[in-house]
Amino acid sequence: MSRLPSEDTLLEVNIEDIRVSPFQPRRTFLEEDLKELVLSIKTVGLIHPPVVREIRNGDKVLYYELIAGERRWRALQLAGYKTVPVVLKQVLADDMAAEATLIENIQRVNLNPLEMAEAFRRLIVVFGLTQDKVAKKVGKKRSTVANYLRLFSLPQEVQEKMNSGEISLGHAKVILSLEDENLRQILSQKIISCKLAVREAEMEAKRLVKGKGASLKEDSSSQPSSRLGFCQERLATTFGYPVTVKPQGRRICVSFFVEGEEALEALEKALTTSSSEAILT
């Protein structure tokens, strides 16, 4: 066992004693990428050990929770390693460990766009940070954070296709450039069914807007749809969850889509702590 300059500890642990953080935003690990990493580890060794913290019950260590390096840990498992060197962080409270996990993942380039958006969302909802504070913590512009959060206003099918890599961030930006929700749905379906390139999607978006004189800013009959689209996008960006805003007779129905009790509690907290000014600005 040796000491690092930061006073964190370098040690060898059983690979089966390591667990994934519940705050890990990354959900997609491509097998081909892991195989390439396995080859690299076998060739040059493990240059950067995973970073963990201890989860204890009194004096007993129950397991080690990953703060950084899940991809490396998975590659080591695939390579058949039984033990693995890790950097053991000194005692971290749950909130500090969760924040460190999210920030470490954001600062890496291998998250897909929706995983990045999810990491930003958790920092905002779970830790009560503003978009400005999130941007400063992760070294990005506020506009970058806001643009990623806008992805939650995309149709659910588009989000699924983004997770699978069938639709890129470039495609998403083209879809979001349309103000009308119906046109977004039409363009999304066209991108998916025809496998349009980003440039082709841009041309199709222009055609849709011009096709029926449908520029929402010029067509007064489309103003209600434009207003609902604005509200939907603003709510999704502010709270970081997929949301729909649809007319039902004389009423407007706002629906949030969350998975599990933890997400529901986080949304409830966000709804009770967010001011109207934060939503509308």
Swiss-Prot record:
Induction: In infected human monocytes transcripts are present by day 1 post-infection and last for the 7 days of the experiment. In patients with confirmed synovial Chlamydia infections, 6/8 had transcripts. In infected human Hep-2 cells, transcripts are visible from 11-48 hours post-infection. Keywords: Chromosome partition, DNA-binding. One of its GO terms (biological process) is positive regulation of sporulation resulting in formation of a cellular spore. It comes from the Bacteria. InterPro entries: Chromosome_partition/occlusion, Cro/C1-type_HTH, HTH_ParB/Spo0J, ParB/RepB/Spo0J, ParB/Sulfiredoxin_dom, ParB/Sulfiredoxin_sf. The keyword Cell membrane does not apply. SUPFAM superfamilies: ParB/Sulfiredoxin. GO terms for molecular function: DNA binding. One of its GO terms (cellular component) is chromosome. The keyword DNA-binding applies. Pfam families: HTH_ParB, ParBc. Belongs to the ParB family. Involved in chromosome partition. Localize to both poles of the predivisional cell following completion of DNA replication. Binds to the DNA origin of replication. This is Probable chromosome-partitioning protein ParB. It comes from Chlamydia trachomatis serovar D (strain ATCC VR-885 / DSM 19411 / UW-3/Cx).
